[in-house]
Amino acid sequence: MSDVYADWESVIGLEVHVELNTKSKLFSCARNRFGDEPNTNISPVCTGMPGSLPVLNKEAVRKAILFGCAVQGEVALLSRFDRKSYFYPDSPRNFQITQFEHPIVRGGRVKAIVQGEERYFELAQAHIEDDAGMLKHFGEFAGVDYNRAGVPLIEIVSKPCMFCADDAVAYATALVSLLDYIGISDCNMEEGSVRFDVNVSVRPRGSDELRNKVEIKNMNSFAFMAQALEAERCRQIEAYLENPNKDPKTVIPGATYRWDPEKKKTVLMRLKERAEDYKYFIEPDLPVLQLTEAYINEIRDTLPELPYDKYQRYLHDYALAEDIAAILISDKHIAHFFELAAAECKNYRALSNWVTVEFAGRCKTQGKNLAFSGILPSSVAQLVNFIDKGVITGKIAKDLADMMMESPEKSPEAILNEHPEMLPMTDESALVAIISEVLAANAQSVIDYKNGKTKALGFLVGQIMKRTQGKAPPNRVNELLLAELDK
């Protein structure tokens, strides 16, 4: 069956809803803040009261323009708003204000690394719209919280330019990182700040046809996205294989599904609506949104260094491995931490390992982010410098790192001043004595080494380091051990 599956490929496009981190909502002065008591951040506009009129939030427009500039899209000098009509309890007006025909951004692309290769994922458009409220279920009844109603969104629509789950996850990851870098959203997927609607169809490999697509709604996890895409891919392929003589348009009807993580399958929600079902028409209460080139350029000039550009710089300036550079730039706060530390430590590879592996592992067990742990970048730089200068051994450095996690305000130097017993052995006569004891206790290993078995040397070094509790300088141990063995 897997060989049959290999003859098919997925065609995937994503619609990403991004909540903008403005202080107020898109068309009213109601507060835009997650987690408050239900129905406390509301106004006549976002609850659809008769006679209330929308007023466009300038900051939301600025953030949408900033996104357009970041993806090198075409920011429209003229765009407008439309009403998308539908009835649902969380939409008190019975319509959404969106941009159907004239979006604020057209085109653009997102750069990503997929399995070590550089990829560009093309965008169709990005438009501004307001969010709906939220239904909360309580046993046999449900309540509606309108705190989210009217929260500003940009919906980012990709072209169907992804052909497997890995592509989709790489694009989504790169997009969220980009949004975080430019600071237009808090990108908290658990709180729904970024939600993915995934459109997927399948076709015989080598074909260029676009068959009926299925939409999987409201994905808020990269892992669930990958699982859902693979499950839906298999479902559609099996349907086509079971109905080889049917018109493909009738085999997979356009529909909306959700992902059930417990059953590991997509579940039908409803058949797909057509655009005309929403009865789009121009929003009569909002004027055309008119921008100037000067205003767009002013916003473009505020763009920070973007993730992919930072990734390339890390490869070039710091000579880091691709996987390490990718880990560092995936979190802008960690990247900033690393750069501050790199200003004081030139062993960039060792430093990156301490940031992404040693301290990252310790922080993960405590549910922390190194950038917010209280540990200073200069302290991590000092730790690596101490290793390079022979002030401490690698074993001592790890013990120091543990103590830094407990007392983040203290530098390695301060900890060593308080605990001089942690410093490495400097008494060579004592070290030579330990080496002699180890050689006497491991005569067979000495014979093996002299017979050309180099692994025996590593064993002897390990025994010496064990006796010294990791405090002996490894380079000096090797020198003295070889001198003793050559006698």
From Swiss-Prot:
Q: Which InterPro entries match?
A: Asn/Gln-tRNA_amidoTrfase_suB/E, Asn/Gln-tRNA_Trfase_suB/E_cat, Asn/Gln_amidotransferase, Asn/Gln_tRNA_amidoTrase-B-like, GatB, GatB_C_1, GatB_Yqey_C_2, Gln-tRNA_amidoTrfase_suB_CS
Quaternary form? Heterotrimer of A, B and C subunits.
What this protein is called in its record is Aspartyl/glutamyl-tRNA(Asn/Gln) amidotransferase subunit B
Per UniProt, which keywords does this protein have? ATP-binding, Ligase, Nucleotide-binding, Protein biosynthesis
The organism sits in which domain of life? Answer: Bacteria
Question: Which reactions appear under catalytic activity for this entry?
Answer: L-glutamyl-tRNA(Gln) + L-glutamine + ATP + H2O = L-glutaminyl-tRNA(Gln) + L-glutamate + ADP + phosphate + H(+); L-aspartyl-tRNA(Asn) + L-glutamine + ATP + H2O = L-asparaginyl-tRNA(Asn) + L-glutamate + ADP + phosphate + 2 H(+)
Q: Name one GO biological process term.
A: glutaminyl-tRNAGln biosynthesis via transamidation
Specify whether ATP-binding is a keyword of the entry.
yes
Summarizing the function annotation, the protein's role is: Allows the formation of correctly charged Asn-tRNA(Asn) or Gln-tRNA(Gln) through the transamidation of misacylated Asp-tRNA(Asn) or Glu-tRNA(Gln) in organisms which lack either or both of asparaginyl-tRNA or glutaminyl-tRNA synthetases. The reaction takes place in the presence of glutamine and ATP through an activated phospho-Asp-tRNA(Asn) or phospho-Glu-tRNA(Gln).
Query: What EC numbers are recorded for this enzyme?
Result: 6.3.5.-
Q: Which family does it belong to?
A: Belongs to the GatB/GatE family. GatB subfamily.
